[in-house]
Amino acid sequence: MSWLSTSLGKTSERAGCHRERADAINSGSSGAGPSDFRAFGLGGLGASSDLTESLRDLFKQMSETQEGFPPMMFLNALRTAFPQFAQKAKDGHGYAQQDAEEAWSQIVTQLRQKLKSNDASQEASESFIDKYMSGKFETVMECDEQAAKDGGEQPVKGEDTFLKLNCHITAEVNHLREGLAAGMQEKIEKNSEVLGRNSMYTKTSRIARLPKYLPVHFMRFDWRKDTSKKAKIMRKVTFPHELDAVEFCSEDLKKLLIPVRDKIREIRKEEEDVERARKRRKRIQHGEDVEPAEPKGKGPASETELAKEKKDSQKKASGSTDVEMEDVEYKTDAQIEAERTASILKAKKELLELVDGELLADDSCNKTGLYELRGVITHQGATADSGHYTSFVKKEGQKDPVTGKRKEEDGKWWWFNDDKVSEVDNDRIETLSGGGKY
């Protein structure tokens, strides 16, 4: 999520970005590669005070070294474009602490304005950000007072664009899903023409388009009027490694996504069953004790079957002639892998047939409703004006030099802490849900 990353904060603010879980649909990389950037005018390299060009240069420099270096050109461009980030610390030493989400939003807004497509096959006004990172809400605004409804005031329908989803944190929110649901309803005070005065309205939002990359902002910093400062909400809010966004979608979009999402889950289960069966055959082949994958029931009958299977496998392993044996031919790993590959290809074909033409026409939208967590930005500290930001990015599998495809991921993450980069286990990500240091 790291932009590809999910930002959750160090007991503080968290924000995050999920990448569409589409490994069962896309045969290639689901990310945007160099050719995609060139299509939006990010081809060359050269020192520049322009924020967009400086970011391009920064990405290129980072790709050419594993050593740490200060991104001064980019920082100078950011401070020039947005003077708030050039604010000095109150003690006069260095720059003031800034909010990561504010910096992210300003950078994305700038990129959205500057990165216009120069590809003849795309709309001239289309932005890279709009294409890959923007979603759409269908909204309904309705007055809370019955008197307005009785007077004939109708709900107002509209459409909004979003570049991130907000996870609102209240005393009732314990999980990301609950925080996102809270953000889908908003109370607004506005004038009612029917009542002739201000009244409270409820604005309900439902997602009509899911982007390929989805940032999620955990709203852990809240403005306190009594102290005139931002306070950090330390409440623990857990989050999944796979986000199912279907429940937040409009009814029309749900109808398109649910068949695809359910098919993906079915394919995963089949793959898991095949892998379990392969391991079980290996254990039997080597004469190891083995339990049936799914016992038919409890009681003497099942126990007898278990004992018989165990006894038979032991006799086969020892070559005993006490019982009549049939020759058993075991499949090789190559045969099993070939069958598995054929099964996956067939399942992918069936899956593609389930994807609606409307979704297929939009090559940069999410077609499954599922997102995989790829990165997390965290904040350590109790206040917004101090602390320390670090980030976690999920490791990609190594590229096979022969096929060019990436190998299976090992589930580990890179932890970026200033110029120090270290590898951490998946369990470390579970500690970033707040309620403590993070």
Language-model-detected regions and their locations in the chain:
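UBL (ubiquitin/ubiquitin-like) substrate-recognition surfaces
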Residues: 1-438
